[in-house]
Amino acid sequence: MSSVSLVASAELPTPWGVFTMTGFKEEATGKDHVALSMGDITTDAPVLARIHSECLTGDALFSLRCDCGFQLQAALQRIAKEERGVLLYVRQEGRGIGLLNKIHAYHLQDQGADTVEANEALGFAPDLRDYTICADMLKLLDVKSLRLMTNNPRKIKAMEKYGIPVAERVPLEEGKNAYNEFYLATKAGKLGHMLHD
């Protein structure tokens, strides 16, 4: 049984082109998730894809504390350039701890904690995201395999585990700046992200 149900689809014009926006409802939590796709993603050729966890601060409020907003825009631009691909926008704010807890974590980071230490000080694991819903979204969209834009090895392992082969990892290093250098170093050093700078 799928962890999500497909609810509706509509066109979504963006600065990079017109995507198809597909809405999903997560059965266990009632959360809404979205896929933005372009072109025919149902063929056997691996699909350029991004699994993007919601980040209100980076995606909508232009925060420089993370690389999320930069990655979101770059992923949509790359999909539009290829005229084929899919981006999953998954409602797992703050690596799954939620917006208000993320603000608490930011406060601890302002005091010197890194992103992992801040989550742990609040009683959370460093990363609470569940990628089962992503695999189920892709299956409902009839996506067979991915060229996954990610620096996170957990996403690759999760897709493979849940039956979505990853033919290629496409690096997505965007938006490094003075405000997020420590954050990116922690992602590489403590969370195993594949970053080169």
UniProtKB/Swiss-Prot annotation:
Signal peptide: none annotated. Pathway: Cofactor biosynthesis; riboflavin biosynthesis; 5-amino-6-(D-ribitylamino)uracil from GTP: step 1/4. SUPFAM superfamilies: RibA-like (SSF142695). Its EC number is 3.5.4.25. Zn(2+) binds at C55, C66, C68. It catalyses: GTP + 4 H2O = 2,5-diamino-6-hydroxy-4-(5-phosphoribosylamino)-pyrimidine + formate + 2 phosphate + 3 H(+). One of its GO terms (biological process) is riboflavin biosynthetic process. One of its GO terms (molecular function) is GTP binding. It is an enzyme of class 3 (hydrolase). One of its GO terms (cellular component) is cytosol. InterPro entries: GTP_cyclohydro_II, RibA, RibA-like_sf. CDD domains: GTP_cyclohydro2. Disulfide bonds: none annotated. Keywords: GTP-binding, Hydrolase, Metal-binding, Nucleotide-binding, Riboflavin biosynthesis, Zinc. The active site is at D127, R129. GTP binds at R50, I51, H52, S53, E54, Q71, E93, G94, R95, T115, T150, K155. The keyword Transferase does not apply. It comes from the Bacteria. Catalyzes the conversion of GTP to 2,5-diamino-6-ribosylamino-4(3H)-pyrimidinone 5'-phosphate (DARP), formate and pyrophosphate. Belongs to the GTP cyclohydrolase II family. This is GTP cyclohydrolase-2. The gene is ribA.
